[in-house]
């Protein structure tokens, strides 16, 4: 039964990822005053399927000098971890209701760094290695603020379980009392998922394509799937943390529709940011985190410790 549930979770995720690639190309197209994909199928709707067929039927090549085992393991690990992170997400019920769901997700996102590092190192290419080192530094740095912001939110929640967050936000979405945290969280998720304007790992002008420069066909597609699965997962996580998950004062009975609309709106914001902003320089990226975000999040964390005590508010599960 568990395997069936697992498949029922994985298949829709992969479908969502496939159509997110189409959505991205369409959004970017219209923002640049062009159509985007419109040949394959009606309005280009079959483009993701054509892309998948093309990628998985190509011959997978790898450099002679690469470490073959690690080279193959890295993309598999990346996709496996990206899919594993969905397990504790309440949609509306999680696959496994973990006591420490948030901690599990943090641990999994930290492990995803290894896949990037291995892929860059095993490729035995200087560009891939530079891209991988940048990705690791960026991901580890931004995880610091993500963890502190999560802690601040969980102080209002009273436990590490995600379903209780939905109960917490029944009357007031957490974006209202902690909007500075929400802004920093959103920017940190952009950096965590290696999206523009923080896509330094894939700086085409300097690093060709970043850590996956030597990958082709299937393994490249796996990295691609992992990246987009992480984007959707992060947006669902943001919805659960700050946007009241399923709650909507106007149409409270449209449970799943509310949730999907919020997550989709956030995803389109990711694409909007990509279309609008130029890439950060590496030192600006680090300066933003260590000099701006970290002091702010620490101060706000202390404020969130005091807030429930000041207002005599008891979290739903203590």
Swiss-Prot record:
Subcellular localization is given as: Mitochondrion inner membrane
Give a single Pfam family match.
NADHdh
Q: Where would you say this protein principally sits, based on its record?
A: mitochondrion
Sorted UniProt keywords: Electron transport, Membrane, Mitochondrion, Mitochondrion inner membrane, NAD, Respiratory chain, Translocase, Transmembrane, Transmembrane helix, Transport, Ubiquinone
Q: Which gene encodes it?
A: MT-ND1
Q: What is its EC number?
A: 7.1.1.2
Bilayer topology reads: Multi-pass membrane protein
Protein name per UniProt:
NADH-ubiquinone oxidoreductase chain 1
Q: Its family?
A: Belongs to the complex I subunit 1 family.
InterPro entries noted in UniProt: NADH_UbQ_OxRdtase_su1/FPO, NADH_UbQ_OxRdtase_su1_CS
HAMAP family in alphabetical order: NDH1_NuoH
UniProt KW Aminoacyl-tRNA synthetase keyword: no
Question: Has the keyword Transmembrane helix been applied to this entry?
Answer: yes
PANTHER family recorded: NADH DEHYDROGENASE SUBUNIT 1, NADH-UBIQUINONE OXIDOREDUCTASE CHAIN 1
- Kindly state a single biological-process term from the GO annotations of this entry: aerobic respiration
Tell me the organism.
Answer: Taphozous melanopogon (Black-bearded tomb bat)
Q: What's this protein's function? A: Core subunit of the mitochondrial membrane respiratory chain NADH dehydrogenase (Complex I) that is believed to belong to the minimal assembly required for catalysis. Complex I functions in the transfer of electrons from NADH to the respiratory chain. The immediate electron acceptor for the enzyme is believed to be ubiquinone.
Q: Tell me the GO molecular function terms.
A: NADH dehydrogenase (ubiquinone) activity
The reactions it catalyses are: a ubiquinone + NADH + 5 H(+)(in) = a ubiquinol + NAD(+) + 4 H(+)(out)
Q: Which GO terms describe its cellular component?
A: mitochondrial inner membrane
Q: Where are the transmembrane segments?
A: 2-22, 70-90, 100-120, 147-167, 171-191, 217-237, 253-273, 294-314
């Amino acid at each position: 039964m568990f395997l069936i549930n697992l498949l029922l979770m994985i298949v829709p995720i992969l479908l969502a990822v496939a159509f997110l690639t189409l959505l991205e190309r369409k959004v970017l197209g219209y923002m640049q005053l062009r159509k985007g994909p419109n040949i394959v199928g009606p309005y280009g709707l079959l483009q993701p399927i054509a892309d998948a067929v093309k990628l998985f039927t190509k011959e997978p090549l790898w450099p002679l000098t690469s470490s073959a085992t690690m080279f193959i393991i890295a993309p598999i690990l990346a996709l496996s971890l990206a899919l594993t992170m969905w397990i504790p997400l309440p949609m509306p019920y999680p696959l496994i209701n973990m006591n420490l769901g948030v901690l599990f997700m943090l641990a999994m996102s930290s492990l995803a760094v290894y896949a990037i590092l291995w892929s860059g190192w095993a490729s035995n290419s200087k560009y891939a290695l530079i891209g991988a080192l940048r990705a690791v530094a960026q991901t580890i740095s931004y995880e610091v603020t993500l963890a502190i912001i999560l802690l601040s939110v969980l102080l209002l929640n009273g436990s590490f379980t995600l379903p209780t967050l939905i109960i917490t936000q029944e009357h007031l979405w957490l974006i209202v009392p902690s909007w500075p945290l929400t802004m920093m969280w959103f920017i940190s998720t952009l950096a965590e998922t290696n999206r523009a304007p923080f896509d330094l790992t894939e700086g085409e002008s300097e690093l060709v394509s970043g850590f996956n420069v030597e990958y082709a066909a299937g393994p490249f597609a796996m990295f691609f799937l992992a990246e987009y699965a992480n984007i959707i997962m992060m947006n669902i996580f943001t919805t659960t943390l700050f946007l009241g998950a399923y709650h909507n004062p106007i149409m409270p009975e449209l449970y799943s529709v509310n949730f999907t609309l919020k997550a989709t709106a956030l995803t389109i914001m990711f694409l909007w940011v990509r279309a609008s902003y130029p890439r950060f320089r590496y030192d600006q990226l680090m300066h933003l985190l260590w000099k701006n975000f970290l002091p702010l999040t620490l101060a706000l964390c202390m404020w969130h410790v005091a807030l429930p005590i000041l207002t005599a508010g008891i979290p739903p599960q203590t």
